Every structure is written in structure tokens, then in C-alpha cells.
Curated annotation (Swiss-Prot):
It comes from Heteractis magnifica. This is PI-stichotoxin-Hmg3b. The lineage of its organism: Eukaryota, Metazoa, Cnidaria, Anthozoa, Hexacorallia. Disulfide bonds join C4-C54, C13-C37, C29-C50. The record marks K14, A15 as: Reactive bond for trypsin. Transmembrane segments: none annotated. Contains three disulfide bonds.
Amino acid sequence: GSICLEPKVVGPCKAGIRRFYFDSETGKCTLFLYGGCKGNGNNFETLHACRAICRA
């Protein structure tokens, strides 16, 4: 889906939550630390969920 093409958004908060996003340049789901607020759709709780939705 189109959410997989959205940029990684850490957001302004500082929670440091382990999440995964789809990196459209590499075609892979990658770990990042999410701040906890004001993110976007390219933000998955698990690697499996990221791969399932973005077909990585």
C-alpha cells in the first residue's frame, strides 16, 4: 500500500519505542526508534506486520 512509501517519522516525542518501517530505497523493513507521537502509517509494531503489509 501507499503507506509503505511514506517516510520514516520519529516524531517530536522521546519515548524510544522499537518499531519497524518499510524502507522504499532498500525494499526492506527496518528497525527504528519511534518517539511515541505524531507518526504516520509507515510504523509497525513487529517486523512480521511490516513485511505482511508492505510485502517485504
